[in-house]
Amino acid sequence: MSTLRYTLVVNGSVYGSQSARTAYQFASALIEKGHTLVSVFFYQDGVTNGTELTVPANDEFHLTKAWQQLAKQHNVRLETCVAAALRRGVVSQSEASQHGLLQHNLADGFEQAGLGSLAEAMLTQDRVVQF
């Protein structure tokens, strides 16, 4: 079996739909099958997966932490679209400084990137799958 290189695009919010959780399950399965997950690009409402201020109920799956653990264990880039993130209040430390904000809330392990990063992934990965 040949292994493939993947990038996932997640458009669904962290808890507003099943999209992000399904993407996480797909990511885990493809890694388990020996494929390489290069990056996950969070776009539109999907950028909410990258806020460190998400606090699910005690009996709920903590999706942001799950993404962080997956990224750390398997060297996966977690990228939030910077424009979509800023519109939705998900702000990195550098963006907070640039815009004169006192606080930032981008979770550890996530970075902010532009659409150029997604375009590059579409050109270089074997598969790009959108959720």
Curated annotation (Swiss-Prot):
Key word Transferase present: yes
Per UniProt, the keywords (alphabetical) are:
Cytoplasm, Transferase
Where does it reside?
Cytoplasm
Cellular compartments per GO CC: sulfurtransferase complex
Q: What is its EC number?
A: 2.8.1.-
> Which residues constitute the catalytic centre?
81
Q: What is its main location?
A: cytoplasm
What sort of enzyme, by top EC class, is this?
transferase
Look up the domain of life of the source. Answer: Bacteria
GO terms under biological process: tRNA wobble position uridine thiolation
Q: What is this protein called?
A: Sulfurtransferase TusD homolog
What is the protein's species of origin? Answer: Vibrio vulnificus (strain CMCP6)
